């Protein structure tokens, strides 16, 4: 039997089939190696492409995950820095806010003091001008400002000087101050309207 099996001729078809069956078996390891290389290279390329972004996304995802201790510490540190920065900003705001009310209060007090001084000055000027307007003979149509009041006072002084130089006041008029004042007021009003003093018109 052994001789028959060994001596039995092998048909070329069976040989080709056996060869074809052996060839895929031989070709499979390289293809498997190539596929493994391709898979490894694709994995490496995917890992490398997602390296910076993946690390960033991983970091972000790790920050979202509360379970990771390292990322929890980082989150605590970042939260602490943010809180410290916020506290510093709050402190700066409080200091600036504390400075601004003081400056506003100082400006307000300065304005109040300036208003008080201005009122005192105007009051101290209005009182003498009111007294001067009572002394100076004025016309009913007069609405004199302070400068006009001073000019009219200067003219009245000039008028009185001329009256004293003329010696036209008699003893009766000079003895009665009210009559003298009325006469001087009338004469000064006439003098103002005429522009000159006329002794003949006064008589």
UniProtKB/Swiss-Prot annotation:
One GO term (biological process): muscle organ development
Region annotation (Sufficient for transactivation activity) ranges: 162-192
bHLH domain segment(s): 109-160
Amino acid composition bias (Low complexity), ranges on this chain: 1-18
Biased composition (Gly residues): 46-65, 80-100
PROSITE patterns named among the record's database cross-references: BHLH
Subcellular location: Nucleus
Entry keywords, A to Z: Activator, Biological rhythms, Developmental protein, Differentiation, DNA-binding, Myogenesis, Nucleus, Repressor, Transcription, Transcription regulation
Region: Disordered, residue numbers: 1-107
Compositionally biased region (Basic residues): 34-43
GO annotation, cellular component aspect: nucleus
Name of a matching Pfam family: HLH
SMART domains (UniProt xref): HLH
Organism superkingdom: Eukaryota
Listed InterPro entries: bHLH_dom, E-box_TF_Regulators, HLH_DNA-bd_sf
GO molecular function: DNA-binding transcription factor activity, RNA polymerase II-specific; protein dimerization activity; RNA polymerase II transcription regulatory region sequence-specific DNA binding
Assembly with partners or alone: Efficient DNA binding requires dimerization with another bHLH protein. Homodimer or heterodimer with E proteins such as TCF3. ID1 binds preferentially to TCF3 but does not interact efficiently with TWIST1 so ID1 levels control the amount of TCF3 available to dimerize with TWIST and thus determine the type of dimer formed.
Function: Acts as a transcriptional regulator. Inhibits myogenesis by sequestrating E proteins, inhibiting trans-activation by MEF2, and inhibiting DNA-binding by MYOD1 through physical interaction. This interaction probably involves the basic domains of both proteins. Also represses expression of pro-inflammatory cytokines such as TNFA and IL1B. Regulates cranial suture patterning and fusion. Activates transcription as a heterodimer with E proteins. Regulates gene expression differentially, depending on dimer composition.
PANTHER family: BASIC HELIX-LOOP-HELIX TRANSCRIPTION FACTOR, TWIST, TWIST-RELATED PROTEIN 1
Protein name per the record: Twist-related protein 1
Organism whose genome encodes this protein: Gorilla gorilla gorilla (Western lowland gorilla)
Taxonomic lineage: Eukaryota, Metazoa, Chordata, Craniata, Vertebrata
Gene field: TWIST1
């Amino acid at each position: 039997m052994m001789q028959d099996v060994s001596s039995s001729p092998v048909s070329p078809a069976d040989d080709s089939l056996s060869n074809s069956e052996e060839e895929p078996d031989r070709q499979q390891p390289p293809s498997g190696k190539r596929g493994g290389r391709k898979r490894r290279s694709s994995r490496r390329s995917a890992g490398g492409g997602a390296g910076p972004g993946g690390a960033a996304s991983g970091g972000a995802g790790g920050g979202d995950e509360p379970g990771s201790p390292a990322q929890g510490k980082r989150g605590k540190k970042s939260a602490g820095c943010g809180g410290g920065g916020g506290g510093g900003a709050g402190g700066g705001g409080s200091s600036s806010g504390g400075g601004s009310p003081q400056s506003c209060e100082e400006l307000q007090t300065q304005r109040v003091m300036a208003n008080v001084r201005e009122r005192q000055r105007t009051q101290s000027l209005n009182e003498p001008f009111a007294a001067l307007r009572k002394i100076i003979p004025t016309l009913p149509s007069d609405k004199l400002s302070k400068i006009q009041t001073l000019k009219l006072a200067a003219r009245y002084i000039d008028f009185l000087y001329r009256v004293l130089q003329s010696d036209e006041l008699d003893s009766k008029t000079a003895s009665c101050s009210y009559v003298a004042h009325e006469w001087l007021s009338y004469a000064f009003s006439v003098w103002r309207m005429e522009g000159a003093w006329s002794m003949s018109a006064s008589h």
